[in-house]
From Swiss-Prot:
Name assigned to this protein: Sperm-associated antigen 11A
Protein species of origin: Rattus norvegicus
Signal peptide limits: 1-19
Disulfide bonds: C30-C59, C37-C52, C42-C60
InterPro entries cross-referenced by the UniProt entry: Defensin_beta-like (IPR001855), Sperm_Ag_11A_B (IPR007988)
Length: 68
């Protein structure tokens, strides 16, 4: 029973301390870069950027937009 309790506490702590960026902010940053959050892979003509807020999603930015 103690093991189950410790596992539950550990699981909650890991989820709450998942990073320094609040949920949803990564999606906003992607949209500000004129990108789209896509699951796993980007379409042709797009390059991969940072991760989005949702698990497994990547920010895909058009390759025609030049780096600033």
């Amino acid at each position: 029973m103690k093991v189950l309790l410790l596992f539950a506490v550990f699981f909650c702590l890991v989820q709450r301390n998942s990073g320094d960026i609040p949920p949803g902010i990564r999606n906003t940053v992607c949209f500000m870069q004129r990108g789209h959050c896509r699951l796993f892979m980007c379409r042709s003509g797009e390059r991969k950027g940072d991760i989005c807020s949702d698990p497994w999603n990547r920010c895909c930015v058009s390759s025609s937009i030049k780096n600033r």
